[in-house]
């Protein structure tokens, strides 16, 4: 525990708070995701850690280790200095087609590897794609909190993910192929990069989940006239946004699509990527902990803290440096969870109404 020092808070997600830390010995920067000890340490957390640990690919954030503090379980990961792809889009408004393709190519290569490892992400979105700090940024997929492994878990049927990115079959409440749903989310990501808006949200009423769901189910989207997008790209999007998952384009087909192959960096070609698909994957794992050690730590973290009194620095020695008038990450997280509850409520209402049916 004493090996790391706190530098700053870097955000809050579905399950915890993230902080930038520095290894005192090596000076390496790492990101730590903190999850409160006790009830929040459930099978989803264990699944996230075990799934993430098994992945070794340059387009996926590296898992390093898990540690337990008096108050939290901390997942230690590679730090991506370039921040979220979402922020880059917000600053740019939208990307050129070439820039969007550059990031989409990397996203697809990372997702392709996850699927090869029998892991579907189930929450792919701009906020879960990070960038390293290099001039030509390398994209890195993160946050495997909703992920499922077909080797370890049943087929998914729960409605998880982020409303704007969710595939029609995920709304069906029946079993679905998580890999095919991931393809849909990749398509939404591509659209947002090109247009600077979500494909199925009503721009005049973006919080109307019922309307968004209706547009998703009826594949109601269009590319604005003021955005120049090539025919090859439009054709690819039309093959991704298909309601019937059996007829949707696959990751393999995307990787062979003419639009995807244009200006494909050498490191993303199938020949260069082949090394990551070998049983003796030589990419560094960075995790010195065995699955057994990890599960033992996770089990320990299921025990709630001895005292309900908050410990400064999430159980580390450093003090929290929160300004009095600023929102704490925990409060931001509660707001996010409230929004998710509202979304789940809306989905249930739509199902109860029988208004939208999947064929």
Swiss-Prot record:
Weakly expressed in roots. Expressed in roots of young seedlings. Residues 299-359 are annotated as: Disordered. It catalyses: L-seryl-[protein] + ATP = O-phospho-L-seryl-[protein] + ADP + H(+); L-threonyl-[protein] + ATP = O-phospho-L-threonyl-[protein] + ADP + H(+). Keywords: Abscisic acid signaling pathway, ATP-binding, Cytoplasm, Kinase, Nucleotide-binding, Nucleus, Phosphoprotein, Serine/threonine-protein kinase, Stress response, Transferase. ATP binds at residues 10-18, 33. The active site is at residue 123. Residues 4-260 form the Protein kinase domain. It is an enzyme of class 2 (transferase). PROSITE patterns: PROTEIN_KINASE_ATP (PS00107), PROTEIN_KINASE_DOM (PS50011), PROTEIN_KINASE_ST (PS00108). One of its GO terms (biological process) is defense response to bacterium. Transmembrane segments: none annotated. It is found in: Cytoplasm; Nucleus. Activated by hyperosmotic stress. May be phosphorylated. Signal peptide: none annotated. Its main location: cytoplasm. It holds the Pfam family Pkinase. InterPro entries: Kinase-like_dom_sf, Prot_kinase_dom, Protein_kinase_ATP_BS, Ser/Thr_kinase_AS. Induction: By hyperosmotic stress in roots. Weakly induced by hyperosmotic stress and abscisic acid (ABA) in leaf blades. Accumulates upon incompatible interaction with Xanthomonas oryzae pv. oryzicola. Residues 331-343 have a biased composition (Acidic residues). Its EC number is 2.7.11.1. GO terms for molecular function: ATP binding; protein serine kinase activity; protein serine/threonine kinase activity. The keyword ATP-binding applies. Gene3D superfamilies: Phosphorylase Kinase, domain 1, Transferase(Phosphotransferase) domain 1. Belongs to the protein kinase superfamily. Ser/Thr protein kinase family. This is Serine/threonine-protein kinase SAPK7.
